[in-house]
Amino acid sequence: MKERGTYFLYTIPECPYCTMAKELLRDKQHKFVVMELNREHATLLRLKEEMDWGTVPMVFQLEGRNHKFIGGYVDLKKKLEGKENDE
C-alpha cells in the first residue's frame, strides 16, 4: 500500500473550500494538521504575500522537515487524484 502523505492547511472559519479540503484528506486517509486563522491574521497575510496566493485553504505537503506548497482545494484534489500535471 502506498504511504499516505501528511498535509498542513491554513484555513479560515466558514470557508467551504477549506471544509472540502479537510473532507477530501479524511476520505483519502491522509494525515493533516489545520491552522484556522481569521482573514486578517498576520501569518495568513504574510503567507499569501510570500506565496503570491490570494485564497484559502493554503495547502502544504510535509516531507520530513521540508514543506511544499500545493495550492488550494482544486490543486490538492488534482494531486490526490494523480492529475497535478493536467491543465
Task: List the model feature ranges, each with a label.
Residues 16, 38, 77:
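Nucleotide phosphate-binding site architecture
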Residues 51-53, 57-60, 75:
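Long, continuous compositionally biased terminal/linker segments
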Residues 1-33:
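Local sequence-structure signature of Cys/Sec-based thiol-disulfide redox active-site neighborhoods
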Residues 19, 23, 45, 78:
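Alpha-helical elements of the RecA-like P-loop NTPase motor core of helicases
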Residues 18, 41, 70:
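Loop/helix-junction capping segments adjacent to catalytic residues or to phosphate/diphosphate-binding pockets
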Residues 23, 49, 71, 75:
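Catalytic phosphate/metal-binding cores of nucleic-acid and nucleotide-processing enzymes, i.e., regions
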Residues 61-87:
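Non-catalytic, surface beta->alpha helical segment in thiol-disulfide oxidoreductase systems
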Residues 36-54, 80-86:
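Thioredoxin-like thiol-disulfide oxidoreductase module
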